[in-house]
């Protein structure tokens, strides 16, 4: 007789980030019978593939932080058949609004991830405009064992009849059985430390990072 498989134990799992890795992670966890919450601080899925023409302002404490790392004319450096998920290939679509090239532009990758999200109903798992600000292992004396506490901040926009839209921030603490971090590596640039670059006489202007470039890239 074959051994009886162990019953699946459903866990409450947090996934941080709704980019490519976060989306497929959420899908696989739900397929295994777990309840999943995806935290995404942006307003849409896509992670590093979300393009904006905005850039960070000067390095001041009050500057606006822009998390996109794409320039306008960027194309993939891998063929599309190497970029898709195994059971959801990145196929060219017969649609005038899509990019059928083997090495497509960033917008096509973004649309592929949006298609993937719709196909598997992942959107219902995502809390948009919600930033995770702290994750820690819960101490046993708090009544839990091997659990994780997540503190998050969610921006909510409320519009009352006849009044302007108001924004409020809701802070929340929740307990999860497991946490999967899928935040990527391209949000904050790594600035090279060059001896003497803090001197005003070394360079006549500030450094410009590739992350802050949007146009005028040769293709």
Regions found by a protein language model. Give the residues of each.
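Core beta-strand elements of the Rossmann-like FAD/NAD(P) dinucleotide-binding domain
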Residues: 9-11, 164-178
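Short interface patches used for recognition in eukaryotic signaling and trafficking proteins
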Residues: 21, 92-103, 114-115, 159, ...
